Amino acid sequence: MSKEKLKKAREFEQEQLKRISPEERPCYHVTGGSGWINDPNGFSFYKDEYHLFYQYHPYSNEWGPMHWGHVTSKDLITWERLPLAMVPEEAYDNFGCFSGSGIELSDGRHLLMYTGVGYVSDIPMANGELPTHQTQCLAVGDGTDYEKYEKNPVITGEDVPAGGSKVDFRDPKIWKDEDGFYYAVVANMTEDGNSRILLFKSADAFQWQYVCVLDHSDEKLGKMWECPDFYEVDGKHVLVVSPMAMMPEGLKFHVGHSVIYLTGTYDKKTHQFIREDVQPLDSGIDFYAPQSMQTPDGRRVMIAWMQAWPNSKFVPDGVKYFGQMTLPREINYRNGKLIQQPVREIENYRGEYVHYENVEISDETVLNGVDGRVLDMTVKLKVTDTFKKFTIKLAADETYDSTITYDPVREVLSLDRSRSGYMYDILHKRDIQVKPAGGEVTLRILMDRFSVEIFINDGSQTATMVLFTPQEADNISFAADGKAQISVDKYALTF
């Protein structure tokens, strides 16, 4: 790796860090050192720490040639910033070091597997852009410094089976299976504009061979599938993909960029994955490109980019960086669904506690002690025929608010941040089909300074959105059209 280009990028990042105060960042969500970030990458455990890398353009708040930023954590909540890990520089990645994953090798080194995007010609195409291709590459390091593999790329367009694109071939997710072999799933667009997930295999993580097509979109479930993840949890195999150009299906799937998970059976001998069901992974506004890992204590933990692509070109005025990650989430499989919960470590940061039991709500009501922008709050709503609508206002004052509303007749939960202060907000509202569980709708709401993550009915559904509301707007209120009954448990989170 070119020491000079990496040194320049690291020095620039260090200078930019001085411009951004801790108060301008979230308390417990990962952000870039400066500039732009998107997909989480290289999520892994190495040398007694969690490592998270991310797609990174440190030089501006807009997407640009992708670098890899880097943070570490002991507990998945508070993160230490390390020098950025990779810069685009070689012929095979001079357009960008795109998304990938990480794993510890048997010899104790840390391996990063990523997509290198390189120019193949200096003659522009019809759209004025220079043609590129995408290949899979490696970098090996000690947890701080990484060297790109001298024989990169290790998987090229020549390894793509017939009918596949050499241009859209990206986002390798690597793991080591019980048979001692390394495997990687890679997203690939087909010649007809659809997508498929390719499976590759290696004895040493350096020399790879194509195995099979694991699954494909087949003119359904969007076009290009990005950022695949494949794992087993609670006896069920799960394939997670982030489709582009998704078509809506009622309130189940939403239009545009999305994230879905496909559950099924997987034969580890024949490598045949038989799909059984498809569900949305998050039904909110800002959630994309999730990546998971298995923790040393056996939990499956996932993190995602907390941003919507359609809004990403409209950076709010005055923002000194753009993009953040979700809170890591524990994943389980129960009753035919993936269940998501905030990682349990967040509970170690709980402070002041307020509890209300069976409070009747009609007109707009403020509960003493229930306010703030950094909190962990659970609201249990009894679903009866005594109200037509129930609303929670968050991050509110006389000018701003964002709302969570439940309609018990339609069984629809609605998010609305049109009054949040996010100018030019293309996606500002989302409706989600939510059925009561045991006569109640339970909402666990995790707020940070610039986000809201909602875990619905014990994590059977989730909804995520960012907020660019001034921090002074920290009121919370409850209201009902009719009479509703709620219980509230609210913890302030302290850091």
Model-predicted regions and their roles:
Residues 10-16, 263-495:
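Beta-rich accessory regions
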